Amino acid sequence: MRILVTDGMDKTAMAQLREHGHEVVEQFYEPDQLGEALRGFDVAVVRSKTKVRKEHIDAAKGGQLKLIIRGGVGVDNIDVDYAKANGIDVKNTPRASSQSVAELAMGHMFACARYLSIAGHTMREGKWEKKAYGKGIELQGKTLGIVGFGRIGQHLGVMAKAIGMKVIAFDIYQIPVISEQLDIPYVEMDELLAQADFVSVHAPAVDGGALISAENIAKMKDGVVIINTSRGSNVDEDALLAALESGKVRAAGLDVYADEPASNVALYSHPMVSCTPHIGAATVEAQKRIGQEIVEIIAAM
């Protein structure tokens, strides 16, 4: 089979595919070129950079394309239903990056609690702000509210409990056996917002507006910390910035943004924002696992 890799892939996994007799082409296509290019491939492997929309699927009709694989979890960059309606299957790799994303969320929690981002920045400016940043808080004993309790949320919950946090979770699809095994109770959204000292979002993008809206921020504790490593659209960035300015929100840790590359300079430049450029799954280990899942998916075709 001919396999297109648009946004990079683990080299070992690509070598395996070639050893199995497949032709692997590593090439990024601009949106106006993508649809026509897809006609010549049986499989397309994409990451978040490549968007496969209706017009690309229409342009690929009559060609070879049978499968689109999203290397990662979220498939909101692919018009999944339209692809399937046109005979093109869509798969993702949900297991591979869960630990990496959860660890980054935990890292942002520590950064927000102890001023790690701004303290490091000011030191590089030659400043010694010991008093200014000597008002950190511990995570032990605090309540973490996880919004979206899938694989990533579960990994984060286990780590948070290990350092002595109380963990509660909200998910529209509740799996009682998971809650019981991890000893992490489900609660309603409003209860989570009212109880949590830290709110970490791990839900897919939702229709109908941001999960972390001005209305929901108002329901949170004063001094709450908000973490988002899911999708940028899950947080109303203007509402978050206003809450940071007012002190309602103590700090925020962000890996994803409404626009990417991020364009809300006031938000990501705020001294109480710990920010990273959408690198949740960008670890050596996660990329190897993603590559192996892709190899397995193609082998099963």
Protein language model annotation of sequence segments:
Residues 86-88, 93-143, 158:
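Phosphate-binding beta-alpha-beta segment of Rossmann-like dinucleotide-binding domains, i.e.
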Residues 149-150:
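Glycine-rich Rossmann-fold phosphate-binding loop(s) that bind the pyrophosphate
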Residues 84, 91-104, 129, 256-301:
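C-terminal helix-to-coil terminal segments
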Residues 1-90, 191-194, 213-215:
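An N-terminal-biased, well-structured beta-alpha scaffold segment characteristic
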Residues 153-154:
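N-terminal Rossmann-fold NAD(P) dinucleotide-binding loop
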Residues 51-56, 172-266, 282:
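Rossmann-like adenosine-cofactor binding region
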Residues 12, 162-180:
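NAD(P)-binding Rossmann-fold cofactor-contacting core
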Residues 60-66, 86-88, 165, 222-224, ...:
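A short helix->loop->beta-strand "cap" motif at the edges of active sites that frequently abuts
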